[in-house]
């Protein structure tokens, strides 16, 4: 799996897939820079007048509901429909699902009406979308990854999608198969945007690998390794935020081989 992760990163840097992000205002700039440092090409476009045309150019689509409004929801549906028609991967980031009915209902409609490739969220978001009682603090999770594992498997089976829960340890499943990624650093939870960046990085990996379970696992491992490298000298959160971009840019095969911690299980 580590060798496959390294090959995916090489493909991203060689092919520079265009990742179309309909994402939130909070993370838009940081996400674009993270994709550039990874080796992909980002575009941030959410106007209903152009999202379908932009999807025609893209290699993957990210739908992030972090700063929702009615026009953005319309754009998300238009873009998702266009992406499905083109058979390009779609990654849904249900930011804050469970916190408000608007967020939860929007995420569920996207799941119900479109063939989402990967659903990437924190434990509280995944539990909420599975209809379980969960607690959120704004858009932050108060549940651990293991608490949401069964919910992730259920959602993966229902929607025929890959579901990825990110946290202290990441859990990725397509229902019958699953993987765990133990890479990362606590500083990743002390700055805004790392979860949203994770979704966009997963989309870039999905653009170059046909198996979304492998792609999501590889992408989350690379981001986690970058977090570990960025935290080597115990920086403060502000410095870490910038060092994470540098670590993505400097990522090499040897970093993946030396630091990657991926465990794969082929049956639940």
From Swiss-Prot:
Encoding gene, per UniProt annotation: thiM
EC number of this enzyme: 2.7.1.50
Pathway the protein contributes to: Cofactor biosynthesis; thiamine diphosphate biosynthesis; 4-methyl-5-(2-phosphoethyl)-thiazole from 5-(2-hydroxyethyl)-4-methylthiazole: step 1/1
UniProt keyword Transmembrane present: no
Organismal lineage: Bacteria, Pseudomonadati, Thermodesulfobacteriota, Syntrophobacteria, Syntrophobacterales
Pfam families for this protein: HK
A molecular function GO annotation: ATP binding
Catalytic activity of the protein: 5-(2-hydroxyethyl)-4-methylthiazole + ATP = 4-methyl-5-(2-phosphooxyethyl)-thiazole + ADP + H(+)
UniProt xrefs under InterPro entries: Hyethyz_kinase (IPR000417), Ribokinase-like (IPR029056)
Protein name, per record: Hydroxyethylthiazole kinase
Family (UniProt): Belongs to the Thz kinase family.
Role played: Catalyzes the phosphorylation of the hydroxyl group of 4-methyl-5-beta-hydroxyethylthiazole (THZ).
Positions contributing to ATP binding: 120, 166
UniProt-listed GO biological process terms: thiamine biosynthetic process; thiamine diphosphate biosynthetic process
Listed cofactors: Mg(2+)
First-tier enzyme category under EC: transferase
Positions bound to substrate: 44, 193
Sorted UniProt keywords: ATP-binding, Kinase, Magnesium, Metal-binding, Nucleotide-binding, Thiamine biosynthesis, Transferase
């Amino acid at each position: 799996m580590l060798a496959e992760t390294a090959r995916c990163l090489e493909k991203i840097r060689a092919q520079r897939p265009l990742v179309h992000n309909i994402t939130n205002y909070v993370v838009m700039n940081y996400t674009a820079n993270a994709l550039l440092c990874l080796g992909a090409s980002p575009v941030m476009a959410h106007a209903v007048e152009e999202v379908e045309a932009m999807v025609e150019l893209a290699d993957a689509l990210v739908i992030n509901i972090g700063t929702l409004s009615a026009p953005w929801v319309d754009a998300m549906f238009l873009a998702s429909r266009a992406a499905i028609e083109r058979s390009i991967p779609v990654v849904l980031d249900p930011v804050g699902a469970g916190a408000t009915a608007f967020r939860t209902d929007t995420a569920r409609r996207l799941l119900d009406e479109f063939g989402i490739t990967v659903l990437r969220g924190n434990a509280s978001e995944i539990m909420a979308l599975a209809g379980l009682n969960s607690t959120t603090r704004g858009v932050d999770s108060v549940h651990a990854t293991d608490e949401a594992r069964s919910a992730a498997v259920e959602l993966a089976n229902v929607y025929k999608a890959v579901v990825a829960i990110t946290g202290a340890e990441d859990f990725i499943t397509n229902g019958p198969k699953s993987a765990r990624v133990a890479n990362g650093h606590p500083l990743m939870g002390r700055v805004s945007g790392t979860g949203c960046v994770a979704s966009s990085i997963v989309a870039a990996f999905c653009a170059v690998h046909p198996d979304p379970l492998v792609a999501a696992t590889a992408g989350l491992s690379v981001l986690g390794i970058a977090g570990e490298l960025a935290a080597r000298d115990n920086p403060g959160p502000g410095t870490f935020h910038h060092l994470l971009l540098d670590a993505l840019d400097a990522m090499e095969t040897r970093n993946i081989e030396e630091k990657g911690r991926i465990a794969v299980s082929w049956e639940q």
